[in-house]
Design a protein with these regions (language model features):
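N-terminal hydrophobic/helix-forming segments and targeting peptides
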Residues: 1-116
């Protein structure tokens, strides 16, 4: 049986959110905050708060960013290979043979694998 933390980690890490396209991650995150106080600003930042008693311990702030390593399709070859360019920083040596999800402009998720 999975813990709530494991469920959330799986949900967030499997939600597509390449740099500049974090809308789906933001939507999933806000859905999970249902019932808790939160707000979102025009830049896409989500702020959430949970009331507590100061006598219970120190205040804690958690911060994270929603985007992940991503690529943009530059070209599709005649043989069907997709040529990509990175969005943000990445390490080329860890990408080979990794599974990817190609998000079509229609919103369709297409599974793939990085080849050399």
């Amino acid at each position: 049986m999975r813990t709530e933390a494991e469920r959330l980690l799986k949900l967030y890490s499997e939600t597509p959110g390449a740099s500049g396209n974090e809308e789906l991650v933001r939507k999933v995150f806000c859905q999970e905050l249902n019932g808790h106080a939160f707000s979102a600003d025009r830049t896409g930042c989500v702020l959430a708060a949970r009331d507590g008693d100061p006598k219970d311990g120190p205040r804690v702030m958690l911060t994270a960013h929603m985007d992940e390593v991503g690529f943009m399709v530059q070209n599709i070859t005649k043989t069907g290979f997709i040529e990509i360019v990175p969005l943000g920083g990445w390490w080329p040596h860890v990408v080979l043979a990794q599974g990817v999800i190609v998000m079509a402009s229609s919103g369709r998720a297409i599974p793939g694998c990085v080849a050399s």
